[in-house]
């Protein structure tokens, strides 16, 4: 497997994989994995896990706020996620996410004065068009639960959904260039 992957990367010869393309390199790698698994009679997941099997599960991310158009609010970012990256195991990660999600409902109620609505992806509907306000509300819910040092944020910006031909990327009531959107997103991390 490693030899095939290395060969594909060397054939491409570019740091960003633009000659063969990441999709082609990935597809060949997966095909090699599938062929190797089939030759041993193992399901793909068992073959990839190796002789010792899977001993850990990645800590998941949890969608807590949904963007889109809800209740007259146009939140451009698609999803706001909580990542309990310091959870000791999957059970604790789920427990943290559930508590934060429930508390976020209370925080949204305090912010808006109304019961929060559930969005199409089963997170709460974003109560503000401003992503910074949404992140602040999530941070408040995390702090209220005592998990400030155990959680991080993630965003599904879905920038293709924000793009309006000839205008740019719609965010916070105005249109941004791609450079401005990147600078804005970078600013959210600081």
Segments (PLM) and residue ranges:
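Short beta-strand segments
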Residues: 29, 48, 63-66, 83, ...
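Short, flexible active-site-proximal loops enriched in glycine and acidic residues
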Residues: 1-7, 15-24, 47, 70-74, ...
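Metal-dependent enolase-superfamily TIM-barrel catalytic cores that perform enediolate-based chemistry
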Residues: 71-190
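Cofactor-binding beta-sheet edge motifs in enzyme active sites
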Residues: 9-18, 22-26, 63-69, 157-161, ...
């Amino acid at each position: 497997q490693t030899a095939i992957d290395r060969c594909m990367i060397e054939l491409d010869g570019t740091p960003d994989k633009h000659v063969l393309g990441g999709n082609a390199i990935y597809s060949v790698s997966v095909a090699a994995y599938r062929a190797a698994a089939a030759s041993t009679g193992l399901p793909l997941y068992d073959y990839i896990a190796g002789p010792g099997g899977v001993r850990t599960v990645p800590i998941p991310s949890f969608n807590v706020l949904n963007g889109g158009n809800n209740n007259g609010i146009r939140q451009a970012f698609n999803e706001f996620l909580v990542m309990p990256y310091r959870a000791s195991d999957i059970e604790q990660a789920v427990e943290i996410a559930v508590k934060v999600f429930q508390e976020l409902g209370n925080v949204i109620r305090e912010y808006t004065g109304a019961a929060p609505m559930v969005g199409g992806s089963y997170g709460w509907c974003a109560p503000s068009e401003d992503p910074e306000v949404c992140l602040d509300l999530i941070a408040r819910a995390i702090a209220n639960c005592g998990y400030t040092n155990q959680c991080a944020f993630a965003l599904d910006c879905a920038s293709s959904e924000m793009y309006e031909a000839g205008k740019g990327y719609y965010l916070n009531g105005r249109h941004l260039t791609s450079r401005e959107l990147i600078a804005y997103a970078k600013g959210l991390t600081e």
